Amino acid sequence: MKYPTVSFRWGVRRSHVCAWLLLLLCVGCATPSRTLFVSPVGNDTNPGTQNKPFATLPRAIEQVRELKRSEEPCGPVTVFLRGGTYELREPIIFTPADSGTSNAPVTYASFPGEHAILSGGKRLTVNWRPTPGKPYWQLDVPSARDGKWTFHSLIVNGESRMRARTPNWGEKVLRAEGREPGGDARQALRYYAGDVNPAWRNPTDIDVVLLCSWTPTIHRIKEIVPETRSIRFFSAHSRTVDAWEPHFRYYLSNVFEALDQPGEWYLDRPTGTLYYYPLPGEDLAKAEVVAPVMKSRMIEFAGDPGKGQFIAHLHLRDLSFRYVDGDMDRYNGVYRQGHMFLASALSAHGLRNASFERCEFTQLGEYALELADGCRDVTVRQCHIWDIGAGALQLGVTDLATLKANEPALAVRNLVIDNNCIHRLGTIWHGSYGIVNRFASQTQITHNEIFDTHWDAIGLDARWDWKGEKFSSGNVVAYNHLHHLGLRYHTDAAGVYQFGPLDTHIHHNLIHDTFAYPYICGFAGVYLDEQSRNAVVENNLVYNTDWYAYFQHKGMDNLFRNNIGAFARDGLIWRGGLNAAWTSNYLEACRNIYIASNDVAISQAWQPGLKPPVLHSNLYHTLAQSTPLTFAGKRFAEWQAQGQDANSVIADPGCRNPAAFDFSLRQDAPAIRAIGFAPFDDEIRKAGLTGDPAWRELPRKYTPRTPTATWTSDDLAKLVAFDLDFNLMKDGEAPGVFQSSEQTGAGFAVTSEIAGTHGPKCLK
């Protein structure tokens, strides 16, 4: 059987020597070590030897427990899984009984030179047939018709495919006319004529994806009402549908009539028919087509830290975890930042002194891995996490009240997330973090490369007040390479984003090419949101961002020092959210270099507040030599006259070739002597993956998705102007597209007192 995932080959080769050394070391241990074997062609009645292996992982886990319970001393235990696919139908659950010790750890790994896949999916038969008169093919899935099996993901030749949607990926999404007239403002929308067809097949299987500013929601259609051009949802949003924009964005997923692009598919549940539009050159008689059977979770590490029950010294290496579906029914309509209500395919509670190394996580419907309450001293290193329905990693505790009730047992500390390749995230849940560190302290997030995701690559989360900061402190985000983020779906985001943590150190990160939805906020390089306190942001390189390079919103006592920013839409840095309740919103920014491609050094004015921001000793430069730099619309001298940027200069910093994104400094660079800038050229080259060349070059094998097209203000004005239907409005309702001056007493509203040209109502 062919496994096309090139991402795993590096790990198998590199693990050969380590695994064989492990075998040799086991022979010489003072306490006898044990090695068990599992094979897809084994038998669970076998003794688990190399010649007579078990057939399933649960049987091997059971045998490890028996070894631990035996009276004879037991040394390290290694379970080798021979190459092939192991289909799971129930989650595997590890308990404290599966623990090892510091001298006798338990390890589950692929056999040296082979590739073991733990699969929550089922391979579909090759009995595909062409659909008459159509470019797609179809397959009977009787269990879908019987209601026994439904799935929201389809994988063909190792890559996930997209459910039929309108508009197609990359096209401008739809715009709503607004709320349903007289309807629930959280549970319905009014569509523009021609965008929705009430006669579509199986309309109650269609999902409406509302693209809010930073967190989208998914709503199953309850009914389409053509008389009012309304779509009503089964589930209500926690806010009004137009909370972010009057003509908010959305698209429709799982629409049979939208099956018009290669790579799209549709499952007709009532008839039990799966339709798929093959990519050019795909032969369904030979293709490996898999649909997930398992939902949300594949493996659980079920400690109970509140009762002092932990799983310890357990290691997973060189394994592949694939094909778990997202539970779109359970989470329909749920809203929360980062989709942190979602489950993870692998979920750990009370896991300690453990590791996941050189593993692959792919085609998983929600998050990939969660290290939750009570997890400590766990390492995730050199894993390839890609093609995921939501995000890669959830770290820490979600609920602050639960944590505070038993903090000594439940606190999450000392996690290491190092040297992982993470990309193509949010294929279902677009507003997901790449890595999110919730209530967890002393986490090290280093040397990861994260790209091709809709929202924040790395997030640190300790809530919107000061109550949680001590439970998320002392975290380090360093030497990460974060790029091609946003895809123009979302905004108010960043490569590194945090709200609430204390004493975070963010350094030596390379962040570039962010793409924001352009009409609400933007997509920064580093963003310190509310209650971020005592953070140090230094020695980072940020360029090509759709907002500021660096940004603070309602933070306190944070330092931005010795960073480089370049070619940001709105300049080097800004402090937002200053108001009467946030007069302590304070930062210091010094010894930073900013290189513009336009005339904007800083785009907005800085209000003083109780503690004014301290900008000093910065260097500004623009490649647009014919246009002077502006600071909140002012010239540099005026800006400094307001007390800003003392000892700062406008000068060429001495970068070798900034137009080609080479920001390394010459030895005689003016920035060194003018502002005391400390070059970090050698260190920033270390950002991203480390190790052998094949691993470091892995990201270059994957092309990020193209950012989606966006509506221009002219596009939207034309849409609104030419689609006003007063007959769908109530008497007295004022169309949102018009404005009037209350000072002059002017006003307008829909009325039925005077007949309109095309119906009983008009505008008065």
Residue positions per predicted region:
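N-terminal secretory signal peptides that target proteins for export/translocation
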Residues: M1-R13
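Extracellular glycan-recognition surfaces and repeat-rich motifs
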Residues: M729-L763
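Short polar catalytic/cofactor-binding loops
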Residues: P40-D44, D725-A734
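Bulky hydrophobic/aromatic "packing anchor" residues in well-ordered structure
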Residues: V38, Y108, L118, L393, ...
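Glycine- and acidic/polar-rich repeat regions and solenoidal domains
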Residues: P91-I93, T101, I299, G326-A348, ...
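Extracellular polysaccharide-degrading/modifying enzymes targeting complex plant/algal/animal polysaccharides
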Residues: F37-E360, A401-E407, A641-A651, F661-K718
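Bacterial N-terminal signal peptides
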Residues: H16-G28
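Bacterial Sec-dependent signal peptides at the C-terminal "C-region" and cleavage site
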Residues: V27-T35
